[in-house]
Amino acid sequence: MTNPRISIVIPTAECEGKKFLPRCLNSIKSQSYINYEIIVVEEGKVAYNMNCGIKKATGDIIKILCHDDYFNGPLALEEIAIAWKGGWLVSGCVHDTGAEEFVMTHYPGWNDHIHRGFNTIGGLSVLAFENKDPLLFTEGLDWVVDIDFYKRAFLRYGLPRFLVTPNVVIGYGPHQTSFKLTEEQRTKEINLMVEKYGL
């Protein structure tokens, strides 16, 4: 597919991380690849919020980009478009601690135990997937909303296409919602994944 249209879904919420939304949007405006649409959604809990954005998407590819994350340079969307082969794609990323200091470069990989909390893919903003009867996120999950999606994407499409270029920057710090979840909630959701997919 040449020149695929990319729907960039940006879930946001009234929280501390929302202050980073302008940085996210500016990183999109600086892209050399221009066949995209931006869908900013603020509809409630994480999974429901993203699902609302997915349902509004008109592009060939749905690209998740959380409001506190941003593209790593002007070629990020073009890299996705060039690498795209259908199904799903995950990219490498770096982390920004808040002072635009990049740390912890992460290269995605697959493991069959991802549903048990061994997330070797990365955060939601590394994800792109096809907009053909698209997968939706499982509502009611917070801690494992990403790995549950990755497991179901694998079961539908097989392995993702790996874009090892770190083309996304993950905003890392205490503003992240995942830091606010209790250990009890995390354990409960991991147990749900084991019940659903096995050991």
Q: What are the roles of these predicted feature ranges?
A:
Residues I62:
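Short aromatic/hydrophobic "clamp" motif used to bind/position activated sugar donors
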Residues A76, F149-A153:
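Short active-site alpha-helical segment characteristic of glycosyltransferases
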Residues E43-A57:
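Glycine-rich, basic loop-to-helix element that forms the pyrophosphate-binding segment
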Residues P4-V9, E37, D148:
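Cell-envelope/extracellular polymer assembly enzymes that use nucleotide-activated donors
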Residues M50-N51, N72-L135, P174, F179-L199:
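Flexible acidic/His/Gly-enriched loops in nucleotide-sugar-dependent glycosyltransferase catalytic domains
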Residues W143-F149:
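Acidic donor-binding loop at a coil-to-helix junction in glycosyltransferase catalytic cores
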Residues G92, P160-V168:
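Catalytic beta-strand/loop signature of glycosyltransferases that borders the donor
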